[in-house]
UniProtKB/Swiss-Prot annotation:
Name listed for the protein in its UniProt record: Nod factor export ATP-binding protein I
GO CC, alphabetical: plasma membrane
Chain sites annotated for binding ATP: 38-45
InterPro entries: AAA+_ATPase, ABC_transporter-like_ATP-bd, ABC_transporter-like_CS, ABC_transporter_ATP-binding, ABC_transptNodI, P-loop_NTPase
Self-association state and partner proteins as the record states: The complex is composed of two ATP-binding proteins (NodI) and two transmembrane proteins (NodJ).
Keywords tagged on the record: ATP-binding, Cell inner membrane, Cell membrane, Membrane, Nodulation, Nucleotide-binding, Translocase, Transport
Mode of membrane association: Peripheral membrane protein
Family statement: Belongs to the ABC transporter superfamily. Lipooligosaccharide exporter (TC 3.A.1.102) family.
Listed CDD domains: ABC_DR_subfamily_A
Length: 304
């Protein structure tokens, strides 16, 4: 694919008087994993709907697989696989039948569809569940089946909306391994997620959006360096405000969330020396991570 598989240019979308996507621009390169991050209500779901032609932008331009959207969205979707946030597998069919039935939407012959099933089941590690009904599968198995179904048409682009929500750690890591194998095969992936570790592990670049606007973009490690650029000490105690008054001189920046004081430090030694041996206090010294970036950009307060 010579052109950008996904391209947004100054896109806007309103619902009534509310501007939910506000001049959003980003472009995804061939073969990269690009993450959309943002708090609830930031406009991520609306962005995906517009990308797939399920909602029309009020301004700006969108292209998917080189096709203008929404005018050629149906044609573009023939080259796209989608993993929705919530599984929409058919509970009346077996694992094998879910794949076979879905292949009909792409006009495949029965012979071609049957030839696809075995390698897709192997990819999803569901070979032993081919004849099981969906209701017999664990949550992780259902997500892997949904991913396998998204690959029926051998898509150039995969769009994944929070693909590991609700999975236990083992199932999540297996899903990550499967996604990395797709990237190694040259697939292009657009992913939304609330798991910062997931974004940091999988994504080549990230776009952080808030209130429909892009507020940061870059590689995970670059964002961590530019937005934080130091270590973090988390201090747990009964009076974080008093602790901040006492310790802020030893930190580059401080934040409070609940009973936790976050101290961003260039040199941790002076601060940790004041904490050692103090009853009722616990602390953790760690490198900065993507969650620190996200919370610095969007705030630590809960957003609905």
């Amino acid at each position: 694919m010579s052109v950008a598989p996904i391209d947004f240019r100054n896109v806007e979308k309103r619902y009534g008087d509310k501007l939910v996507v506000n001049g959003l621009s980003f472009s995804v390169k061939v073969g990269e994993c690009y993450g959309l991050l943002g708090p609830n209500g930031a406009g991520k779901t609306t962005t995906l709907k517009m990308l797939l032609g399920l909602a029309h932008p009020d301004a700006g331009t969108i292209s998917l697989c080189g096709e203008p959207v929404p005018s050629r969205a149906r044609h573009a979707r023939q080259r796209v696989g989608v993993v929705p946030q919530f599984d929409n597998l058919d509970p009346d069919f077996t694992v094998r039948e879910n794949l076979l039935v879905f292949s009909r939407y792409f006009g495949m012959s029965a012979q071609a569809a049957r030839a696809l099933v075995a390698p897709l089941l192997e990819f999803a590690k569901l070979e032993n569940k081919a004849d099981a009904k969906v209701g017999e599968l664990s949550g992780g198995m259902k997500r892997r089946l949904t991913l396998a179904r998204a690959l029926v048409n051998d898509p150039d682009v995969l769009v994944l909306d929070e693909p590991t929500t609700g999975l236990d750690p083992q199932a999540r890591h297996l899903m990550w391994e499967r996604l990395r194998s797709l990237l190694a095969r040259g697939k292009t992936i657009l992913i939304t997620t609330h798991f910062m570790e997931e974004a940091e592990r999988l994504c080549d670049r990230l776009c952080v959006i808030e209130e429909g606007r892009k507020i940061a973009e870059g590689a995970p490690h670059a964002l961590i360096e530019s937005e934080i650029g130091c270590d973090v000490i988390e201090i747990y105690g009964p009076d974080p405000a008093a602790l901040r008054d006492e310790l802020s001189a030893f930190a580059k920046h401080t934040e409070i969330s609940g009973e936790t004081l976050f101290c961003y430090v260039i040199d941790p030694e002076p601060l940790t020396a004041r904490l050692k041996g103090r009853p009722g206090l616990r602390y953790l010294h760690r490198p900065a991570n993507l969650e620190d970036v996200f919370l610095r950009l969007t705030g630590r307060e809960m957003q609905d």
